Amino acid sequence: MQPDLHCRTLAAHTLKHFRALSPLTHCMTNDVVQTFTANTLLALGASPAMVIDPVEARPFAAIANALLINVGTLTASRADAMRAAVESAYDAKTPWTLDPVAVGALEFRRRFCLDLLSLRPAAIRGNASEILALSGMALGGRGVDTTEAALAALPAAQALARQIDCIVVVTGEIDYVTNGQRTLSIPGGDPLMTRIVGTGCALSAVVAASCALPGAALDNVASACCWMKLAGQAAAERSEGPGSFIPAFLDALYHLDVEAANATN
């Protein structure tokens, strides 16, 4: 099964719908990236909400358009809140996305993530090591860094997508997005995206928000990856290093015009 290059024309069309809907995205993410994640969603036109208390998380997940679960700074109490939110989302048919940060390196989060899979995420986004570990094909990985190339994890991603009946995203120099039957590849971005904390976590939030859109989930999620790659490339051209990259990236998302990018690439 060979990946297909994702069509930027479709990404442009999807972005218009995304901005019109402005999906309310319930982000239960890690402490390190909350502000950057919220700003990324806002810059693209979504509406982020960081509701983390278990008493509030359960009812809020039912009224949100989408839910993100990111286990980067998982604790026992936070796990309880996340589980409550996912159960509520599942009952309300709210699409939820799992970001299994460092799932191959730490047992508590691995067991937690595996337990959540029975509640049917709409999407899973991780690097190669994380997807390999979640699929049961390999354990390891250096936290949020990856020791595997994204393409090497594609068979695991495809198998996981078929098993859970969801979209799986393996990110790297080229992102691969699969539903187990069809796979899309999204090149682009810039190495500077790996030199700041939070671009992967922010992508997971955008993926989660895109799952709230009508239409084919595979195309919507691939479009989300395309937006982030294009903004990263544009920001790198305007910045001198990691410090200036972050504001340039947010500006690039805010002004993103996929159709114009098509004309210049």
From Swiss-Prot:
Cofactor names: Mg(2+)
Keywords noted in UniProt: ATP-binding, Kinase, Magnesium, Metal-binding, Nucleotide-binding, Thiamine biosynthesis, Transferase
Q: What is this protein called?
A: Hydroxyethylthiazole kinase
The main enzyme category here is transferase
Q: Which residues bind ATP?
A: R125, T171
Role of this protein: Catalyzes the phosphorylation of the hydroxyl group of 4-methyl-5-beta-hydroxyethylthiazole (THZ).
Q: Which family does it belong to?
A: Belongs to the Thz kinase family.
| Keyword check for Iron | no
Q: Which InterPro entries match?
A: Hyethyz_kinase (IPR000417), Ribokinase-like (IPR029056)
Q: HAMAP family given for it?
A: Thz_kinase
Q: What is its EC number?
A: 2.7.1.50
Q: What are the top taxonomic ranks of the organism?
A: Bacteria, Pseudomonadati, Pseudomonadota, Gammaproteobacteria, Enterobacterales
Question: What gene is behind this protein?
Answer: thiM
List the catalytic activities from the record: 5-(2-hydroxyethyl)-4-methylthiazole + ATP = 4-methyl-5-(2-phosphooxyethyl)-thiazole + ADP + H(+)
Question: Quick one: which residues bind substrate?
Answer: M50, G198
- What species is given as this protein's source? Salmonella typhimurium (strain LT2 / SGSC1412 / ATCC 700720)
Superkingdom, natural source: Bacteria
Task: Provide the GO biological process annotations.
Answer: thiamine biosynthetic process; thiamine diphosphate biosynthetic process
